[in-house]
Amino acid sequence: MALPVGDVGEPFVDADDIADVAVAALTEDGHAGQIYEVTGPRLLTFAGAVAEIASATGREIRYVQVPIEAYVAALEQAQLPPEMVTVIKTLFTEELDGRNESVTDGITRALGRPPRDFADYVRHTAAKGVWNGGATAAQGAVPEVGALLEAL
């Protein structure tokens, strides 16, 4: 997996936890006026996330940090719409810069239980065979990004 993100920790949050908080906030008493910043229970780098996926699937997957300029060029070469490229570039240069390196108690406050850990999500998803599609990291969903990885 090739992305323009270094060793910044992210509080990966399970989409099911987000949905559960939304349902609770919209259907249960006691949530009016509350603000729930939802995060996973721990910080994890993208390299760490890839390592957990590799371990759970038994597949050899590696993470490679690439320069943002090369990543953007690969997206443009793949003919992604310019506005999509801008959003992705902003995400990687302004949002994934360390400002999110914190864990909150939003899920616990909203649901009365801890957030689901990324490792649990990975084990559950791997058991379903979702990542057994056969595409290699070098091929990727965007061939130009795969070619960038091959060149490194």
Question: What residues fall within each predicted segment?
Answer:
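Short helix/strand-capping connector loops at secondary-structure junctions
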Residues: 100-109
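Conserved active-site and cofactor/substrate-binding residues in soluble primary-metabolism enzymes
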Residues: 13, 44, 102, 113-116
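Amphipathic terminal alpha-helices
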Residues: 106, 114-152
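Short, amphipathic alpha-helical "lid/cap" segments that border enzyme active or binding sites
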Residues: 15-23, 104, 118-123
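Oxidoreductase cofactor-interface core, primarily capturing Rossmann-like NAD(P)-dependent enzymes
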Residues: 1-62, 66-84, 90-97, 145-152
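Short alpha-helix boundary/capping motifs
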Residues: 77, 81-82, 102-103, 134-138
